[in-house]
C-alpha cells in the first residue's frame, strides 16, 4: 500500500510514475474524496469544540439557577450531528482505503520502462543449451512413456491442470525440493519454516493478493467462521509472520524458506500452456522471503536473486536473468528479476523464478515495523520474496535437458544423493 501522505502531497507525480506501469490513477476521484474528507473533518472538529464549550456552559448556567433546557437540547443536537459526521467521515475514508488498496507499488528508478514483457531487459545468461543429436521429446512424452507422469488419472480425480507423478519421477520431484531447501538453509542462511497452507483474508491483503486478485484464489467459505484461502505462494504465510510486529534491529535481516504446495485458479490463463506441467492449479514451490532494514533492501534483492540462480547453476541448467520492465512487474514489487530456464522442446527460455523487492508496500499493509536505533522510533521494514525454485517447472527442465536418445533421463550430479545413487531414470 502506498503512503497516504505521498498521495496527498505528490498525487500527480505518483500518477505519472504509475502510468509507466500501465496503471491509470483516478486523480480526480482521489482529489474529490480528499476535499470531502477535509470539509467533513473540519466541520466535525469545529462542532466538537462548540459542543465542548456548550457543555461547559451548562454547569455555569446551572450554578446561576438559569434554565438549562435549551442548552441541553443544543448539546444533544450537536451530538447527533457529530455522530452523522463520523458516519460520513468513515464512509469517505472507506472509499479512499478501497482505492488505495488497489493501487500498485511505485517502480524503482532503476527499473526499465516498458509496456509489457517485450520491454524486459536481459541482464545475464548462464550455461549453453545442449545441442541434441536426436529429436527432442517434451516432458510429457518422456514422463508418459513409462507411466510415471499421468495426466489422465489426474484429470479423472481433479479435472484439468493437475498432474499425478509416480515412481522415479515422483522421487525426482521430491529430491529437487529437498536439494533446494538444504541449499538455502545450509549455504544461504535461511531458516526452514513450515507454514499453514490455508490463510485468512487479512494475510492475503497484507501481501497484496487481496482485494485485487481474488479471482485467482481458491476460497473456502465456512458458515459462522472466517473464510479461508489456499495459499497461492508461501510468500503469503512467510511474509505475514511479521504482520503487526515491531522488530528489534538486531533481529534483521530475517530470512525464511519453505517448501509448500501452491494453489492458483489461473483465471486469466485460458488456452495457455494447456499441455504438461508448466501451468497447474496445484504445484510445489520452494519460497524465500527476507525482512530487512530499508537501506539494505536493494542489496538484498541482488543476494536473493543470486540464491535462486545458484540452484540452477548446481543443477547445470542453462538460464537467463531478466530485469522486468515497469509494465510487466507484479502488483507489490518496486523491482523484480525473473529467471528463465531453457526448455529444449519449446526452444526457448521459460520463467522458473521471480525475485522481488517490495519496499515498504507490504509492510504498510501488514503494519510490520522495526525500531530504528538511530531514531528510537518504529519504522516500516522492507520485504522481499523469490522462488527458489518452482519445483514442477524445475522437474520439467531436468527431464528435458537431461534426456537421452532412448528416452531415459540422466540424474543431475547434485541430486544423486537424494536418489539413492541412481544415475539414470528409465
Curated annotation (Swiss-Prot):
E.C. no: 6.1.1.11
Pathway, per record: Aminoacyl-tRNA biosynthesis; selenocysteinyl-tRNA(Sec) biosynthesis; L-seryl-tRNA(Sec) from L-serine and tRNA(Sec): step 1/1
Gene Ontology cellular-component terms listed: cytoplasm
Predominant cellular place of this UniProt entry's protein: cytoplasm
Binding site for ATP: 264-266, 351-354
GO BP: selenocysteine biosynthetic process; seryl-tRNA aminoacylation
One term of GO molecular function: ATP binding
Transmembrane residue ranges: none
Positions with a binding annotation for L-serine: 233-235, 287, 387
Localisation: Cytoplasm
Subunit record text: Homodimer. The tRNA molecule binds across the dimer.
Comment on protein domains: Consists of two distinct domains, a catalytic core and a N-terminal extension that is involved in tRNA binding.
PANTHER family in alphabetical order: SERINE--TRNA LIGASE (PTHR43697:SF1), SERYL-TRNA SYNTHETASE (PTHR43697)
Annotated protein name in UniProt: Serine--tRNA ligase
Organism this protein belongs to: Pseudomonas syringae pv. tomato (strain ATCC BAA-871 / DC3000)
